[in-house]
Amino acid sequence: MIKRDGCSQAAVEAALWDSPYEPLATNLKGVIDMQQTYGLERMGLINPQVVYRNMSPAWLTEQALLNQEGVLSDTGALVVRTGKYTGRAPDDKFIVDTPSIHDYIAWNNINRPISKEKFNALKSKMLAYFQNRPIYLFDGFAGADEQCRKKFRVVNELASECLFIRNLLIRPTAEELAQYGEPDFTILVAPGFQCNPQVDGTHSQAAILVDYESRTVLIAGTRYAGEIKKSVFSVMNYFLPNEGVLPMHCSANMDPVTKETAIFFGLSGTGKTTLSADPNRKLIGDDEHGWSSRGIFNFEGGCYAKCINLNPEKEPYIYNAIKAGTLVENVVLDEDTRHPNYF
């Protein structure tokens, strides 16, 4: 997943949410079971048009193109515009305040409370919104250390956002997927759902609500995929300290000979990814890690790097990764060649 901040945004066409195309009903292994719901009804999500679970990058890219969610670059990457939100929306994020978690949150103008009643009401609306729509489902893991990894289920309205989280999280093997069971945490992602601040208690038409008690995240009204990523980190940041693990916003790499690890701390855009992508060292991860008694491990299985001023000589790993199967946000393409303009 690649993104660029600060570019001008085109309006999202209405066709994005009401595509005239029918979902693809087959994959390379044969016909998809159009009746399988993978237990979504247990969380109240009923009557989906169809549920596509853990589809391949090629399939998700094809579906995103059919849905008019984006276009291809000259290297085959899927390029999308995220509309109004080209970054995270901190004013739109809330944590459900309940007695069981109240004393564990540093409440302030960033960690702001919302009631359980408001959360449940908005969740019911979003579940109704998903009815009679195709759902792009991803079941995966956060945490390379199997002793403290968490199972995340991400329910997506858009194929492109399913491609994002499929690339970012740790993907289960076929055997792990068959035995996946119930997730530890579920994230509902509906960019086309618009909140009503006066009724829903939100700051705007967008909202990111985290309920640690019911282990559910609601993301509405924003197509910026970084909200999914940071929601996963928020969950890991809340639960892992009680398991003796220090969550860290950092990149990390390792000397291939001595096995010594270097950690690079910094805010977004300060160079963590660039510093960790050293061709002479082994990359552990570029953004989110845990530090346990067993060592340092990556939460993720992919990379979400800024590509403004991206240079193939200075950052060859990132530059060469922008190809078929990857997702690029908010990068301008040459109209004739489809070559990205990173500058």
Task: List the predicted regions and their residue ranges.
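N-terminal accessory targeting/assembly segments
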Residues: 12, 16-179
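Generic, well-ordered alpha-helical scaffold segments in large soluble proteins
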Residues: 129, 234-239, 278-282
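Charged, amphipathic alpha-helical linker segments immediately N-terminal to NTP-binding catalytic cores
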Residues: 183-185, 189-239
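A structural signal for short, well-ordered beta-strand segments and their strand-loop junctions
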Residues: 135-140, 263, 284-285
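Short glycine-rich loop/turn motifs
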Residues: 204-206, 248-251
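Glycine-rich, often acidic-flanked micro-motifs
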Residues: 21-76, 84-85, 241, 249-267, ...
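Conserved glycine(s) of the Walker
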Residues: 271
